[in-house]
């Protein structure tokens, strides 16, 4: 699914890779779409909970997401397929993964530690900045094989840019 999307994914290839059979796959997930939804849900939960979220350190969280995107480019590809094939507009993921983060941003805003504005828009901006060098980038997709100095340079730029964007 990560290389061909939901439409291009073939059940025979999926069951061979998972070492299962069609009856088990359909019995558990109901359909190929159900499997795709379960995979997206699992991968989204993993990446968004990979590091601690601190609304007072959105720059640090963004750098953590940059590193997660390097370690797990498959999630970014799955999200791109989801956007292309099933949800061309609006919220991409399940809101339940965002609620606690948005509440934390709202509290930080009320305390004057994060700039005013719609918490969801700020959250989306930080996510987009963290994905600037991900496989979803239209300009450049970074890989773990690149020199660490390149990643350090990007991390520093990302940290500073997010800090400037969210500081009141």
Task: Annotate each language-model stretch with its function.
Residues 3, 13, 17, 27-67, ...:
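Alpha-helical structural segments
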Residues 3-7, 72, 111:
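Short coil/turn segments at alpha/beta junctions that flank glycine-rich nucleotide-binding fingerprints
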Residues 10, 24:
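Residues in the helix-turn-helix
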Residues 59-92, 127-138:
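Helical hydrophobic small-molecule/effector-binding pocket
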Residues 91-93, 110-127:
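All-alpha amphipathic helical-bundle segments outside canonical DNA-binding/catalytic cores
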């Amino acid at each position: 699914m990560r290389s061909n999307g939901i439409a291009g994914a073939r059940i025979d290839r999926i069951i061979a890779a998972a070492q299962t059979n069609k009856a088990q796959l359909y019995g558990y997930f109901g359909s190929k779409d159900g499997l795709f939804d379960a995979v997206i849900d699992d991968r989204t939960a993993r990446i968004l909970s990979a590091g601690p979220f601190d609304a007072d350190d959105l720059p640090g969280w963004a750098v953590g997401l940059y590193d997660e995107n390097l370690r797990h480019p498959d999630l970014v590809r799955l999200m791109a397929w989801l956007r292309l094939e099933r949800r061309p507009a609006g919220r991409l993921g399940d809101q339940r993964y965002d609620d606690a983060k948005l509440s934390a941003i709202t509290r930080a805003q009320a305390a004057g530690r994060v700039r005013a504005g719609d918490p969801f828009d700020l959250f989306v901006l930080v996510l987009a900045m963290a994905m600037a060098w991900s496989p979803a980038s239209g300009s450049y997709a970074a890989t773990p094989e690149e020199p660490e100095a390149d990643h350090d340079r990007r991390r520093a730029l990302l940290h500073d840019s997010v800090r400037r964007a969210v500081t009141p």
